[in-house]
């Protein structure tokens, strides 16, 4: 078993200001997105659409707003609506944490629609350009989660080579033991807990980096290197992220205030299913539209 390093969440102290790793990871993600975007500008079919470096900078501004506002509102509405209805001012306490990818995704989508309207472009043309830039940011965000030792995975077999002990999960581990006597006996978890006061868990943040970040980036980046029907790159992002998130959620610990929902699925899985369906529908529409246009030419 591997013990999580339990990093200091503060990366740098600048006088009274504490710069946290999680915030730095957001910065790294946005910088990586700019780099990927500028690489894409060199592709002939992208350059032919008239994209410029200034467009990337402007899209970044819209993207930051969409990510922060959408991510926060998504967390409030999807995960803890009851709490925030009773404590409305706590919505603004962003420093206490609480962001949702699915909310951030909706926020960025709306921001790109607004950007497209201002630039007189079709919004799918904008999202097709942006989609390959997103996974690097997702990977950076999940790395921030791992550094913070948060959003850990479900309890697993201590003999698994990937099993990791998370000091931040001690309280959850103690509460987990009496609820799962079969697994405690099967995996001899009582002995593990007596020795470490922790239980082995999946490092699900690393799984998400691998699937939602690295794998999705390469799939999108190489798919988008060739001209595709409008909407196809966006569709592949929806399908790819939805499948990656849905899969990883089987290893990720559900939010303790929600648990598992209908059919034994987590909130993250239920929010990912519409993305997959929408992505498939958009992909079919994109290629049918191109075939129709080619037949009419």
From Swiss-Prot:
It is found in: Cell inner membrane. It is an enzyme of class 2 (transferase). GO terms for biological process: lipoprotein biosynthetic process. The keyword Transmembrane helix applies. It comes from the Bacteria. Pathway: Protein modification; lipoprotein biosynthesis (diacylglyceryl transfer). It is a multi-pass membrane protein. The chain crosses the membrane at residues 17-37, 59-79, 97-117, 230-250, 257-277. A 1,2-diacyl-sn-glycero-3-phospho-(1'-sn-glycerol) binds at residue 142. GO terms for cellular component: plasma membrane. The keyword Cell inner membrane applies. GO terms for molecular function: phosphatidylglycerol-prolipoprotein diacylglyceryl transferase activity. Belongs to the Lgt family. Catalyzes the transfer of the diacylglyceryl group from phosphatidylglycerol to the sulfhydryl group of the N-terminal cysteine of a prolipoprotein, the first step in the formation of mature lipoproteins. NCBIfam families: lgt (TIGR00544). HAMAP family: Lgt. This is Phosphatidylglycerol--prolipoprotein diacylglyceryl transferase. It comes from Burkholderia multivorans (strain ATCC 17616 / 249). The gene is lgt.
């Amino acid at each position: 078993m591997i013990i999580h390093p339990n990093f200091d969440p503060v990366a740098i102290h600048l006088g009274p200001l504490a710069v946290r790793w999680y915030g730095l990871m957001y910065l790294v993600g946005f910088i990586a997105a700019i780099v990927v975007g500028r690489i894409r500008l060199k592709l002939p079919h992208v350059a032919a659409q008239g994209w410029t470096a200034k467009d990337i900078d402007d899209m970044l501004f819209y993207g930051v707003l969409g990510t922060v506002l959408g991510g926060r509102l998504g967390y409030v509405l999807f995960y803890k609506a009851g709490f925030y209805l009773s404590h409305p001012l706590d919505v603004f306490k962003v420093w206490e944490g609480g962001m949702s990818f699915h909310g951030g995704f909706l926020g960025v989508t709306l921001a790109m629609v607004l950007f497209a309207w201002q630039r007189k472009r079709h919004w799918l043309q904008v999202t097709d350009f942006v989609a390959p830039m997103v996974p690097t940011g997702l990977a950076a965000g999940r790395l921030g989660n791992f550094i913070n030792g948060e959003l850990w995975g479900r309890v697993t077999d201590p003999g698994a080579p990937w099993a990791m002990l998370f000091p931040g999960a001690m309280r959850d581990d103690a509460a987990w033991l009496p609820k799962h006597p079969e697994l405690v006996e099967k995996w001899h978890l009582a002995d593990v807990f007596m020795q470490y006061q922790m239980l082995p868990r999946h490092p699900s943040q690393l799984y998400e980096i691998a699937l939602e970040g690295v794998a999705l980036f390469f799939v999108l980046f190489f798919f988008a290197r060739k001209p595709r029907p409008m909407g196809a790159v966006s569709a592949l992002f929806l399908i790819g992220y939805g499948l990656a998130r849905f899969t990883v959620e089987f290893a990720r610990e559900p939010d303790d205030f929600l648990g598992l929902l209908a059919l034994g699925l987590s909130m993250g899985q239920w929010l990912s299913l519409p993305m997959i369906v929408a992505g498939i529908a958009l992909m079919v529409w994109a290629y049918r539209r191109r075939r129709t246009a080619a037949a009419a030419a």
